[in-house]
Amino acid sequence: MKKFGYSITWIGMDGMKWKHLININLGMVNLSDIPYIIIIHCGANYVGEEPSGNLMYDMKVAFSSLIIEILPGCSIIFSEMLPKRTLRFSYSTHKMEKTRKRVNRGARSCLLKLLGYVIKHPDFEDKYNGLFAKDDVHLSFIGYDIFINTLQGALESLFVLSSLPGLQLITQ
């Protein structure tokens, strides 16, 4: 991203939930300026652990708080939750996939209304073996490469097109 004059800082936390996101971003803002862009990739580990209504509520609160109160002028990008071949908190992968898709749709709808952006990950929808590690939950090295490449492509599109008013970036 250096060719666009931007640097990237990765802030991650094992087990992060949506309700942690606000405090993490408050801490980040206290240490430095408000960033130009934040990409949020969070929530898939808790599909099945929390009711989907609670998960969507936490997402909406986080999006609204970040965009309106904490990070004015910052572009918020939601990286949709990836499918998993196996889910930790469910005996029915099919039901959890339906929940994941429903929550992604809800997050996408909410964020686009708030003039945020969404990154989709269509390469993962077919759940090819090579994209996942042996545990069928985490990504393989190839899966991570594709994931990062999708994020980079979306960011490059945003940087090139960011001068367009009302742009709603949904990469495919």
How should each PLM-predicted stretch be described?
Residues K2-I22:
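A short beta-strand-loop structural module common to alpha/beta enzyme folds
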Residues K3-S7, I24-T171:
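Alpha-helical cap/lid subdomain in secreted, periplasmic
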